[in-house]
């Protein structure tokens, strides 16, 4: 049959799923997500009042939401915080209302505190995506302000829809055609949480994050958040002894613990997004060393013609190797002073490849030896790639002499220039 699809053996599918979760757990541990969640917990403790104050200001600027700040915060706490932390809401609202009476200098301090929290979140997500250069200047401030503005507005929209559905359930049968008010009241907060996390996962990191994987990771994090909230509430109800120990301050450690759990879930979702991207690319990509030398070859060609390689072109070059690897490669090559960024935003070689041998390149890289020396042979491999594989195979057998060749000499293998997409060279020239 022409329409028959190849059947993936159950064992192969199981091994693939197992490898994915191994990758996810390894990334979570290597990126220090638990330590980052702890740091964000304390940052949140200091920034929660400024963020609530900013939400007061944002909501008061929207005519339809004026006077709804207290109701919105109660609704947000009811959804996002287990019942054990609700007793803190009155105190936080009191602090936030008092903060609205501050002077201009005090308001600037609150805004700066809120921005610093978002900056910490950006740094954490950039570390997950292996990005070393955060956004700077006006672009960064605009993104932070957009997040501070959209968050309260999205919550306000959720509150408005919830109120509308509740009123429709009382006065008409409209909601029954849509599946019932209880179903929608349960689903809507989940959808808004997914939307906000999608915004965080795809917009905050200073790199290109695929939207589809961002939505999948956000939905999974929102689901885990719901499960964790139920489990946490059940635990608190079944183990009330903490109230005997802490007394009137019992809500504080419980609230801190919940913030830590929430940030752990959020960062776990970010790791899931990256794992989805990396694992999908890993299924079809060439080995990292091969991909890196390919990228250097493109830089070398541009150097020969005196041209700059732009980020958009680099991502096109790395489409087969895996776009997500560009951030790691850029960091490695910049730190090794092999490439540098131009004022126009492109990248060029900063060293003469005649003075750098293949062995020196291998020594610069932090990857394990078995990873560095792997090169994939393909039917369309260019002459220099065939020479690279031959030399790497000999090096894997313990003979390091084949690596004593400059990168310039490697790329100048016979017929290499003729074989490399002559139509593209014609356009570049």
UniProtKB/Swiss-Prot annotation:
GO annotation, cellular component aspect: plasma membrane
InterPro entries: UPF0761_bac, Virul_fac_BrkB
Alphabetized UniProt keyword annotations: Cell inner membrane, Cell membrane, Membrane, Transmembrane, Transmembrane helix
Residues passing through the membrane, by range: 45-65, 102-122, 141-161, 184-204, 216-236, 256-278
Main location: membrane
The keyword DNA repair belongs to this UniProt entry's keyword annotation: no
Family note: Belongs to the UPF0761 family.
Record protein name field: UPF0761 membrane protein ABO_1543
């Amino acid at each position: 049959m022409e329409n028959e699809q190849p059947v993936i053996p159950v064992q192969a599918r199981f091994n693939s799923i197992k490898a994915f979760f191994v990758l996810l757990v390894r990334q979570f541990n290597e990126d220090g997500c638990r330590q980052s969640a702890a740091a964000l917990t304390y940052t949140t403790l200091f920034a929660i009042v400024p963020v609530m104050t900013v939400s007061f200001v944002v909501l008061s600027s929207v005519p339809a939401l004026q006077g709804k700040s207290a109701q919105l915060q109660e609704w947000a706490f009811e959804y996002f915080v287990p019942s054990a932390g609700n007793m803190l809401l009155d105190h936080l609202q009191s602090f936030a209302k008092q903060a609205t009476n501050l002077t201009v200098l005090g308001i600037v301090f609150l805004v700066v505190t809120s921005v610093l929290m978002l900056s910490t979140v950006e740094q954490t997500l950039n570390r997950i995506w292996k990005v070393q250069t955060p956004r700077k200047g006006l672009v960064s401030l605009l993104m932070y302000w957009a997040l501070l503005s959209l968050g309260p507005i999205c919550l306000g929209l959720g509150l408005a829809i919830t109120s509308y559905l509740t009123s429709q359930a009382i006065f008409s049968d409209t909601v029954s055609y849509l599946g019932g008010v209880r179903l929608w009241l349960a689903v809507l907060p989940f959808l808004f949480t997914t939307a906000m996390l999608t915004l965080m996962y795809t917009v905050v990191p200073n790199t290109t994050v695929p939207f589809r994987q961002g939505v999948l990771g956000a939905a999974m994090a929102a689901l885990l958040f719901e499960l964790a909230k139920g489990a946490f509430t059940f635990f608190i109800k079944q183990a009330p002894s903490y109230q005997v120990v802490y007394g009137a301050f019992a809500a504080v450690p419980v609230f801190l613990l919940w913030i830590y759990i929430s940030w752990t879930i959020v960062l776990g979702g970010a790791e899931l997004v990256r794992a989805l991207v990396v694992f999908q690319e890993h299924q079809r990509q060439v080995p990292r060393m091969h991909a890196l030398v390919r990228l250097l070859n493109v830089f070398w060609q541009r150097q020969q013609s005196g041209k700059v390689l732009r980020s958009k072109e680099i991502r096109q070059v790395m489409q087969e190797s895996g776009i997500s690897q560009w951030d790691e490669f850029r960091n490695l090559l910049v730190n090794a002073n092999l490439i540098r960024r131009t004022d126009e935003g492109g990248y060029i070689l900063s060293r003469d490849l005649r003075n750098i041998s293949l062995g020196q390149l291998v020594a610069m890289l932090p990857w394990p030896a078995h990873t560095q020396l792997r090169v994939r042979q393909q039917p369309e491999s260019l002459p220099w790639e065939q020479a690279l594989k031959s030399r790497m195979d000999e090096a894997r057998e313990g003979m390091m002499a084949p690596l004593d060749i400059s990168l310039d000499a490697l790329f100048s293998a016979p017929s290499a220039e003729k074989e490399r997409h002559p139509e593209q060279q014609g356009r570049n020239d």
